[in-house]
């Protein structure tokens, strides 16, 4: 299953700079 990068799903996906929260956190 290919899903778009989601910030806060505890997974560092391609193109993401965060992996466990919002960029503000």
From Swiss-Prot:
Ca(2+) binds at residues 6, 9, 11, 13, 16, 19. A motif (D/ECD-tripeptide) lies at residues 17-19. The keyword Secreted applies. Residues 4-25 form the Disintegrin domain. One of its GO terms (biological process) is venom-mediated suppression of platelet aggregation. One of its GO terms (cellular component) is extracellular region. Keywords: Calcium, Cell adhesion impairing toxin, Disulfide bond, Hemostasis impairing toxin, Hydrolase, Metal-binding, Platelet aggregation activating toxin, Secreted, Toxin, Zinc. Its EC number is 3.4.24.-. Binds 1 zinc ion per subunit. Its cofactor is Zn(2+). Expressed by the venom gland. Belongs to the venom metalloproteinase (M12B) family. P-III subfamily. P-IIIb sub-subfamily. Monomer. Botrocetin and vWF form a soluble complex. Metalloproteinase that binds to von Willebrand factor (VWF) and induces its interaction with GPIb (GP1BA), resulting in platelet aggregation. There are two distinct forms of the vWF-dependent platelet coagglutinin. The dimeric form (snaclec) is 34-fold more active than the metalloprotease botrocetin in promoting vWF binding to platelets. This is Zinc metalloproteinase-disintegrin-like botrocetin. It comes from Bothrops jararaca (Jararaca).
């Amino acid at each position: 299953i290919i899903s778009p990068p989601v910030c806060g799903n505890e997974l560092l996906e391609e193109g993401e700079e965060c992996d466990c929260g919002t960029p503000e956190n």
